[in-house]
Amino acid sequence: MAMKKLLIASLLFSSATVYGAEGFVVKDIHFEGLQRVAVGAALLSMPVRTGDTVNDEDISNTIRALFATGNFEDVRVLRDGNTLLVQVKERPTIASITFSGNKSVKDDMLKQNLEASGVRVGESLDRTTLSDIEKGLEDFYYSVGKYSASVKAVVTPLPRNRVDLKLVFQEGVSAKIQQINIVGNHAFSTEELISHFQLRDEVPWWNVVGDRKYQKQKLAGDLETLRSYYLDRGYARFNIDSTQVSLTPDKKGIYITVNITEGDQYKLSGVQVSGNLAGHSAEIEKLTKIEPGELYNGTKVTKMEDDIKKLLGRYGYAYPRVQSQPEINDADKTVKLRVNVDAGNRFYVRKIRFEGNDTSKDSVLRREMRQMEGAWLGSDLVDQGKERLNRLGFFETVDTDTQRVPGSPDQVDVVYKVKERNTGSFNFGIGYGTESGVSFQAGVQQDNWLGTGYSVGINGTKNDYQTYSELSVTNPYFTVDGVSLGGRIFYNDFQADDADLSDYTNKSYGTDVTLGFPINEYNTLRAGLGYVHNKLSNMQPQIAMDRYLESMGQSADTSSFAADDFTFNYGWTYNKLDRGYFPTDGSRVNLTGKVTIPGSDNEYYKVSLDTATYVPIDNDHKWVVLGRTRWGYGDGLGGKEMPFYENFYAGGSSTVRGFQSNTIGPKAVYKNGAHTSWDDNDDYEDCTQESGCKSDDAVGGNAMAVASLEFITPTPFISEKYANSVRTSFFWDMGTVWDTNWDPSSAPSDVPDYSDPGNIRMSAGIALQWMSPLGPLVFSYAQPFKKYDGDKAEQFQFNIGKTW
């Protein structure tokens, strides 16, 4: 080979080039060292071609271009006559990527970050990028207080210029805050100020929010909390002068010192509004009214700005700008607030689109909209659409996005982004109690049938005492105006004596149809007709049953009886919950009732009222107080009694947890000669007492009251991804059932007064709900702490497909 003349000294990573002051014509280009990169690809990345006249600048540009591809660790350009010889050393190819020792950061998150930096299997390894990644990961650990953490990239060579990449983590322990000092505070004590921080130097056992583990982001949030605390109390000149974070020599302890200047308290002297108010000055002025002498309050100023933006948003001004500038008068310690408003352009809606509704049809979502296409944009109407979609219960999350139309100064598209949840549920329930043993129930419910919004349910129960089946269908939009139509048919064969109720058998079947009429956004009225046939048999004489039979003109010794009833059913629902399942804010009231109409054998009425109110106690709605009540009352008409099988019952997972289902309230008092189970061992014996025999068999009552107070908390050990699917709560339940027609003189002296509503049962416990693929799962454990003779405890209860 002819002697090669070195043209240019090494450039970048000890690269060598040719030297040629006058340049030469390239007749050929040869490569040495290519393995994975094709010759054609390398040639395309070079600015030099065969036939070009090149000089030292062209050669330098060639080297830079080859390095820029990211495929090479070293590049040398040499001349052999008129041939350009390019010697390269390819970067190794990553064959595999593994992680070791990472506990705080998941593998998937690490892979995403590596891929974002171009580090992935099959790509070339850039050692410079790798060093940046090591430093970035260590900085992350430092930001969460793990100052002893280290991250090292271990590169293991493999044949064919490949490498295995392994990131080895030494996470260490989080540095704990030893002390937080605030210097310069005079108006408030350090303890008072720190009590509002997330970071603490001392955390009581009951404080589930406070944290001694240092995190840079939490400190920034706490400093902002400190600033807001002072600004909300009139300290308009408040300033955080400096913050020092000191680390102990072993890197396990943190000392934080915050130096502040409080300044004086200032009062608002007035608010002046200017700018483009879009003709809504009077409404904006109402939002800026202040009380004379009111202390300056930063949070109220921010709220005022937001209220002005919301007001303008209702009129189609989608992107208003509102800026408040306080003018501080140090002489008289007052602040004049100058508010500049720029309403901007007014927009109308070109299209409303939906994303994420893979099952639900667009029409099901679109009919819930209050914002119309082609109309001026109204932020309140867009929000109403979001609320209505949430209340459907079909979606885990609903978000809105107002997007400008490219090229248009006054058009936007409104996009509703939904995440669907499983609206079908397999209803399976199981309960266990010390006295009740095991009980089961099953059913299937689909609240969004084939994405149409129809609700279809098939429910059934089969056990020792009941065979029940029901088919129900509801069309929520029977008319375009939102009138709903629902109906059901059912069959029930109920052996009450095997269910720890008073002794009788009832075979019933029936049907009903109901129309629902929306009154406004939150109120719906319902009306319908129903028919039910009841055939009673095997009735053992007891006082409550005798009262009913006698009112129907039947003998007290009657053992069988049949009745056909037609009812007018009615109801009212007020629903202002923020979403259909796992609500966190708002309230719901449901009133239902029925009354028999002419042609019925029975004459009676029943009415029930259910209420639920959710009150969030934090901005993220993770801590929520829930109050619920259930009331019921019924009675006979025209001298007749309400049928005993229509009585109200309490106890169980849907009313008072910790008690066996339906066992709270009046118990059967059997008459002399009745053959029933009444003694303490549940042995079947004849009642031989002239005045009657008391029992533990529940008969229910014509009046009921149930209340519950529940504290909903974040579920421990559940990631943010599943936070909307799991709910934990601590509860206190109470309830009672009574019989307003009970006559104590008709029963033995040792029988309680069942007309007394003061016989209240109470329990407390913990519940866990999970929206599983099978439907909602509900676990509860409750301990009754106020009960009466004859009550049956059932501490643990488990249901699939049922919540209350």
Curated annotation (Swiss-Prot):
<feature type="signal peptide">
    <location>
        <begin position="1"/>
        <end position="20"/>
    </location>
</feature>
<dbReference type="InterPro" id="IPR010827">
    <property type="entry name" value="BamA/TamA_POTRA"/>
</dbReference>
<dbReference type="Pfam" id="PF01103">
    <property type="entry name" value="Omp85"/>
</dbReference>
<protein>
    <recommendedName>
        <fullName>Outer membrane protein assembly factor BamA</fullName>
    </recommendedName>
</protein>
<dbReference type="InterPro" id="IPR039910">
    <property type="entry name" value="D15-like"/>
</dbReference>
<comment type="function">
    <text>Part of the outer membrane protein assembly complex, which is involved in assembly and insertion of beta-barrel proteins into the outer membrane. Constitutes, with BamD, the core component of the assembly machinery.</text>
</comment>
<dbReference type="Pfam" id="PF07244">
    <property type="entry name" value="POTRA"/>
</dbReference>
<dbReference type="GO" id="GO:0051205">
    <property type="term" value="P:protein insertion into membrane"/>
</dbReference>
<feature type="domain" description="POTRA 3">
    <location>
        <begin position="175"/>
        <end position="263"/>
    </location>
</feature>
<feature type="domain" description="POTRA 4">
    <location>
        <begin position="266"/>
        <end position="344"/>
    </location>
</feature>
<keyword id="KW-0732">Signal</keyword>
<dbReference type="GO" id="GO:1990063">
    <property type="term" value="C:Bam protein complex"/>
</dbReference>
<keyword id="KW-0472">Membrane</keyword>
<dbReference type="InterPro" id="IPR000184">
    <property type="entry name" value="Bac_surfAg_D15"/>
</dbReference>
<feature type="domain" description="POTRA 2">
    <location>
        <begin position="92"/>
        <end position="172"/>
    </location>
</feature>
<keyword id="KW-0812">Transmembrane</keyword>
<dbReference type="GO" id="GO:0043165">
    <property type="term" value="P:Gram-negative-bacterium-type cell outer membrane assembly"/>
</dbReference>
<comment type="subunit">
    <text>Part of the Bam complex, which is composed of the outer membrane protein BamA, and four lipoproteins BamB, BamC, BamD and BamE.</text>
</comment>
<dbReference type="InterPro" id="IPR023707">
    <property type="entry name" value="OM_assembly_BamA"/>
</dbReference>
<keyword id="KW-0677">Repeat</keyword>
<feature type="domain" description="POTRA 1">
    <location>
        <begin position="24"/>
        <end position="91"/>
    </location>
</feature>
<comment type="similarity">
    <text>Belongs to the BamA family.</text>
</comment>
<dbReference type="InterPro" id="IPR034746">
    <property type="entry name" value="POTRA"/>
</dbReference>
<keyword id="KW-1134">Transmembrane beta strand</keyword>
<feature type="domain" description="POTRA 5">
    <location>
        <begin position="347"/>
        <end position="421"/>
    </location>
</feature>
<keyword id="KW-0998">Cell outer membrane</keyword>
